[in-house]
Amino acid sequence: MVQRLTYRRRLSYNTASNKTRLSRTPGNRIVYLYTKKVGKAPKSACGVCPGRLRGVRAVRPKVLMRLSKTKKHVSRAYGGSMCAKCVRDRIKRAFLIEEQKIVVKVLKAQAQSQKAK
């Protein structure tokens, strides 16, 4: 005959926090084991990239709190909050803006020297 199963905790509804799986004990009984919720890795701070960040553990917030810093970020500028592609683009953009400022300054200086002559 099939063995009947009962929940081991007080919550008797099939909610997200009450998910279970079957497990066979050494005494050949089948019992419920409660499964933990799956974690998600953080998304990029840029808000453009659709995927999750690589190099960061995908765990629940309570577990994340206990992890060491090396498991929560990657050793790069904006590591753990922004993906590598976005960081690369941001650095390039900042460089080009600085170059543009220098070009404007040089052109202004040339115009001043032309006026002086």
From Swiss-Prot:
Keyword Cytoplasm: yes
Glycyl lysine isopeptide (Lys-Gly) (interchain with G-Cter in SUMO2), cross-linked positions: 108
Function text: Component of the large ribosomal subunit. The ribosome is a large ribonucleoprotein complex responsible for the synthesis of proteins in the cell.
Superkingdom of this protein's organism: Eukaryota
UniProt entry keywords in alphabetical sequence: Acetylation, Cytoplasm, Endoplasmic reticulum, Isopeptide bond, Phosphoprotein, Ribonucleoprotein, Ribosomal protein, Ubl conjugation
Protein name: Large ribosomal subunit protein eL34
Primary location recorded for the protein, binned into one broad class: cytoplasm
Location relative to the cell: Cytoplasm, Cytosol; Cytoplasm; Endoplasmic reticulum
N6-acetyllysine found at: 36, 43
Transmembrane residue ranges: none
Molecular-function GO terms, alphabetical: cadherin binding; RNA binding; structural constituent of ribosome
Subunit structure as annotated in this protein's UniProt entry: Component of the large ribosomal subunit.
Phosphoserine: residues bearing it: 12
GO CC annotations on file: cytoplasm; cytosol; cytosolic large ribosomal subunit; cytosolic ribosome; endoplasmic reticulum; extracellular exosome; nucleolus; synapse
Stated family: Belongs to the eukaryotic ribosomal protein eL34 family.
InterPro entries found in the cross-reference section: Ribosomal_eL34, Ribosomal_eL34_C_sf, Ribosomal_eL34_CS
Keyword Protease in record: no
Gene3D superfamilies membership: 6.20.340.10, 6.20.370.70
Pfam families reported for this sequence: Ribosomal_L34e
A GO BP entry: translation
